[in-house]
Amino acid sequence: MAVQRIKLLGVPVDVCSKQDLEEKILQLLEKKGPSQISFITIWDFMKIRCKNEYAESIRNADLILPISKSILSGAKFLNKSVPFRYNPFDAFISILSILESRYKSFYIFGGRKKALAAAEKNMRSTFRGLQIVGRCVGYYQKQDEENIIQAISKASPSLVLVSEGIKKKDFWSYSNKEKFSSGIFLYYRDAVGILSKRIKRVNPKVFEKGHEVWGEIIRNPLRIFLIFPFLWYIILLVWTKLF
């Protein structure tokens, strides 16, 4: 089944089964110019409804994969095709495995120096067929960005992981797309932290139940206020259903 893009409350979301993911990745590798894969939570979803740089970058992404269960529930509630939910870490590992099986290349961008080195070391031991062609720390000075872009462009990787310490997040690759001739760009904030074992990944059972947000609230209690955009999402769904 081909990947289908639906519009939920005006926000694009892709319906991409786990079986179709490999074919889609291969298509992006063959595509002329850079590509972008984005994971979105329900709070990302609500931001995309606004007019801003972040929304623009996601709306133009080549593959938009939902993380939050509530996005799937919303699609079902409005009688639309229901997307497949992705655990970002599992999806990231699957993408790396696809690249490794075809001896493709990879560039790591983000994280602190120590964590980045540990992440690269662990990846080299796990994905032996994957060519890691470069790495660059996040939290960099603005004047260093052009050199970073040139380094990535010169390495010409099949996949660029954009991780923590990149202020523009998904918008970084979109805003610089004219400076790259190829490659898939994927923003996943926690990737370097998990790969370096500095951050513990969400328990798969907790993720399956859709309870991963509670871990985020424990780490940052202010995230409890995310309940308000979620309630607005529910109101919008009901309004759209009725009217």
What are the functions of these language-model segments?
Residues M1-L9, S101, W239-F243:
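Short, Lys/Arg-enriched, disordered terminal segments
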Residues Y107-G111, A115-R124, L130-A155, E164-L195, ...:
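Internal alpha/beta domain cores that form substrate/cofactor-binding pockets in large enzymes
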Residues S57-N122, T126:
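Portal/gating segments that form or line small-molecule/metal binding sites
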Residues C50-K51, F77, E120-K121, W172-S175, ...:
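Short amphipathic alpha-helical segments
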